[in-house]
């Protein structure tokens, strides 16, 4: 392996760079995990040194994309957002009847659409000053949330390692009619629990997620326990896979479990 799993497994605390390296290599992630930081102080936000800021207004999905795929540290505030759903979920504005009109397509019922809107996870109204997204491996601050775009079997392994690392036997998630990424971040932050949801219309079309992936969110304070469990488990079994016999290199090798026709023997 290119990664020294044995050495990492002996460390009491991993750096964010080591966490990212372990997760990207062992889970075979397609994208960088994204560290998300919420700024509640205007001065702290203004003084934060980012590599990039949005030019035109963007969605949260597009802003996170720059960290997930282009390795940039980005900061943004309400003035940078064109996505009304994100403004509401991040507490930059209050929910309104006008916003309900855009939700009726999900319910075919205006009153129930309003109920669905008001049930979304939201950060405290008027408190957030801005936010940062950065590749986990180069985050300059402790993240509030770590956001990942993963396939189903990657999610399976990540969440199982969360369970093992945090000693929490089951997990439950929050799905809303849209606002998958912004609402997913808000719910993870508010509840301090992992979250997983499908793409919404915005995250599918604006977030460059065309391959049917899932959105996954881990509380920032828990990412060390998750990554630590991953490297300890891999060191014990020889590989990260939990599918079939443990210890294979690829998490989610696409073969039938215990199929007698898929069997290898030593070469002569």
What is the meaning of each model-derived region?
Residues 3-268:
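Acidic, serine/proline-rich low-complexity intrinsically disordered regions
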């Amino acid at each position: 392996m290119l990664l020294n799993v044995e050495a990492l497994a002996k460390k009491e605390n991993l750096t964010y760079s080591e966490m990212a390296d372990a997760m990207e290599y062992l889970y075979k992630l397609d994208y960088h995990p994204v560290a998300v930081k919420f700024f509640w102080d205007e001065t702290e936000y203004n003084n934060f040194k980012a590599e990039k800021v949005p030019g035109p207004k963007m969605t949260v999905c597009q802003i996170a994309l720059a960290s997930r795929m282009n390795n940039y540290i980005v900061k943004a505030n309400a003035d940078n957002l064109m996505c009304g759903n994100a403004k509401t979920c991040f507490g930059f504005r209050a929910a309104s009847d006008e916003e309900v009109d855009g939700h009726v397509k999900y319910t075919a019922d205006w009153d129930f659409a309003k109920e669905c809107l008001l049930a979304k996870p939201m950060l405290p109204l008027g408190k957030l000053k801005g936010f940062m997204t950065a590749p986990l491996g180069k985050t300059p601050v402790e993240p509030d949330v770590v956001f990942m775009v993963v396939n189903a079997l990657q999610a399976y392994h990540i969440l199982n390692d969360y369970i093992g690392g945090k000693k929490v036997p089951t997990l439950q998630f929050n799905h809303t009619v849209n606002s998958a990424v912004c609402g997913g971040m808000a719910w993870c932050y508010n509840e301090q629990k992992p979250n997983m949801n499908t793409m919404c219309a915005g995250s599918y079309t604006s977030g460059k997620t065309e391959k049917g992936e899932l959105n996954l969110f881990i509380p920032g304070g828990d990412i060390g326990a998750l990554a630590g469990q991953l490297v300890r488990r891999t060191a014990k079994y020889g590989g990260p896979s939990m599918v079939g016999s443990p210890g294979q290199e690829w998490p989610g090798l696409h073969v039938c479990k215990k199929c007698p026709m898929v069997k290898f023997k030593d070469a002569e």
